[in-house]
Each structure stands twice: as C-alpha cells, then as structure tokens.
Amino acid sequence: MASSAFAFPSYIITKGASTDSFKSTSLSSSRSLVTDFHLLFSRPISSGPKYQSAKSAKPESPVAINCLTDAKQVCAVGRRKSMMMGLLMSGLIVSQANLPTAFASTPVFREYIDTFDGYSFKYPQNWIQVRGAGADIFFRDPVVLDENLSVEFSSPSSSNYTSLEDLGSPEEVGKRVLRQYLTEFMSTRLGVKRQANILSTSSRVADDGKLYYQVEVNIKSYANNNELAVMPQDRVARLEWNRRYLAVLGVENDRLYSIRLQTPEKVFLEEEKDLRRVMDSFRVEKI
C-alpha cells in the first residue's frame, strides 16, 4: 500500500510449553513409590524368641531363623526403596526448579519478504498479522497489544528519491519523524498533553551495501484527572502511557521505505535485544 513520504499511518493499535503433563507424570511416579514403600513395611513380621540367658538358651528353631531372615530382607528392600524414592523426589525438585530456564528459550523469528514492493524484515514468530490496518503490512504482539510493527513506503509517482541523503542528515530526518508522530497523536480531548523527545538518530550501511537511517523517540501522554475543574490545583495530570518508537528508513526503487515499531517503554527495556534485531533486519530490495 503506497502513501506519500513520511505519511505514516494515523492509527494506534493498543495492544507459552505447558509443564502440567510433566508434573503429573513425575508426581504420579512418586506416589507409586510411596505406596510401594508403605506396602513393604505393612507386611506382618514374625518376631523371634524372647531373650534368654546363655545357660538356659536353646538352639533356635528353623522357623524362628526363617522369620528373622524375612525381616532382614524386608528391611533391606525397604531401605533400597526409600533411597530410590529420595533420589526420585530430589530429581523432581531439581527438574522443577530448572523448568523456567528450560522453557525460556531464545525467541524464534520469521522473515517477511515482499518481492512485489521490494522489502523484507524479521519479526517474532508469535506476532500476528492485522489486515486492513492502513499500512502496507502490520504485525502486533497478541499479548501486549500496544506493541506493533508496520511498514510503509512512498508512491514512485509522487516522489523520486535516489538516496536518503536527499532528505538531509539523520538529525534532520529525526526532527521530521518527530513532527509526524506528534501530528498523528494529536488529541482533541481537554487536558491531554503529549511530551516527546528524540532519543537518538543514526545512520548505518547494512550488509546489502545500502544506507539506512534509524530514529528513536519517546512519547508520553498525560491527561488531567478532572479536565473541567476551574482551579488549576484540581486538575492533576496523570501519565496515560509511555512508549518507545523506533523507525528505520531506506531508499530504493525511487521510493522512501520506513519500518516503524511501537512498544511500551517498560516492555522495550525487557525486550530491547530482540526488538533491535527486528529493526536491524529491515532491508529494501530492487524490483
């Protein structure tokens, strides 16, 4: 979907392997061992003859000897079962303690390639595509609804870009991107204020030999808790949201391409490495 240069979409879309089977199997096995353990010790054990003095003691009968032998065997088997149960339970505790680490695997990325319009990028595997969102392509996190990614490009009929340098330096482009963001997020509600800052602007030559600009912006939205109050002290501004916006721009096919990522500031701090990988993967291709 084509649009004019820097005509970013004027929308904001706000926005687990189970271990139950493992636990139930392990606990079931543990219960089975405990049951066997109690069954072994619940068997009746015949007692031997009462203690007698050395003079009056009589030779033990074969029956008494067999009873003592059975008791010793039962105790030995019981001890082995007890040791096995202890080892099993300790292993279960250790394995359960390591479950978060085992399932905290490296995020998997998919690659989106648009050979018709000439661009590609990687995105988290669990993100879903949203159609009809206004951009050429739009993905969002299914859990964190404020976290999304979109791509737009200018129409070749209304623009003729040969290089990013036609737009100026990264700093100049950053100011234009910031103004575009503020225009999009302008609110007509009373008592609403947007506070925006450019965090960084940079340029890089990627492995495809092409130049890319990157702009990072932080925007906070404040709203009064009582916007109709007469006295200023009754209108207390509260933070509605705090988001990080990243944009990467490239030029190819006489078009200006841009990929934009929006995420809550708190989420960005937790997922910064993965989100930067997404932005660094953006490429424009000759068509």
From Swiss-Prot:
Compartment(s) of residence: Plastid, Chloroplast thylakoid lumen
Biological processes per GO annotation: photosystem I assembly
Disruption phenotype: Seedling lethal.
SUPFAM superfamilies assigned to the protein according to its UniProt record, in alphabetical order: Mog1p/PsbP-like (SSF55724)
Keywords: Chloroplast, Plastid, Thylakoid, Transit peptide
UniProt KW ATP-binding keyword: no
NCBIfam families per record: PSII_PsbP (NF040946)
InterPro entries (UniProt xref): Mog1/PsbP_a/b/a-sand (IPR016123), PsbP_C (IPR002683)
Family of the protein in this entry: Belongs to the PsbP family.
Primary localization: plastid
GO cellular component term, pick one: thylakoid
Protein name in UniProt: PsbP domain-containing protein 1, chloroplastic
GO MF annotations, alphabetized: calcium ion binding
Transmembrane parts of this sequence: none
Superkingdom to which the source organism belongs: Eukaryota
Task of the protein: Photosystem I assembly factor that assists the proper folding and integration of PsaB and PsaA into the thylakoid membrane.
Subunit composition and interactions: Partially associated with photosystem I (PSI) complex, but is not a subunit of the complex. Interacts with PsaA and PsaB, but not with PasF.
